[in-house]
Amino acid sequence: MARIETTTRIAAPRERCFDLARSVDVHVRSAAGSAERAVGGRTAGLLGPHQEATWEATHFLLRLRLTSRITVFERPSRFRDSIVRGPFARLDHDHVFEDDGAGGTLMRDHFDYAAPLGLLGRLAERLFLTRHLRRFLDARNAELKRIAESDEWRRYLRDGVAPTDLA
């Protein structure tokens, strides 16, 4: 099993960062490099407790499908999405949000995963998979930071609710 940890400082309130991080629409936008899209479960708006989303994305020239569920939800401090079905033997992604003491947020990711195929999977983790997933998380976090620190966040949130959830 492998673990990736990241910390991103965002000059925006914790509640905004929390909600943007659980937005299906922001996720799709921030994962454009892998042509990721939501194809099942919650496909727009904000993911909440026990909700699932099924994602399709291209990684290593393979079109992959993964379904995750929100298994921990403590707004605005943290949430966890865990794999239900997909190409990993195990995957838990904890998103943690802390006030930075200056009106902003420290967003921390704890990404625990295990590749399938036993020894071959562990070898893949060490040789290339962890590096690939870290780059994916870093790119996603940079886009989330950019959105949160600009007025663009208003396209995705209104009073802690996604505009698509208001219809």
Q: At which residue positions do the language-model features occur?
A:
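Glycine-rich portal/gate segments that line the openings of hydrophobic small-molecule binding cavities
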Residues: 28, 38-85, 106, 139-155, ...
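Residues within alpha-helical segments
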Residues: 18, 22, 82, 110, ...
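Hydrophobic ligand-binding cavity/cleft-lining segments
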Residues: 1-48, 162-167
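Beta-strand/loop substructures that line and gate deep hydrophobic ligand-binding cavities in soluble
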Residues: 80-137
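Beta-strand elements of well-folded, non-transmembrane domains
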Residues: 10-12, 59-61, 72, 87, ...
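Short, surface-exposed coil-to-beta transition loops
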Residues: 3-5, 63-67, 90-93
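Generic structural detector for well-ordered beta-strands
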Residues: 7-11, 56, 69, 96-98, ...
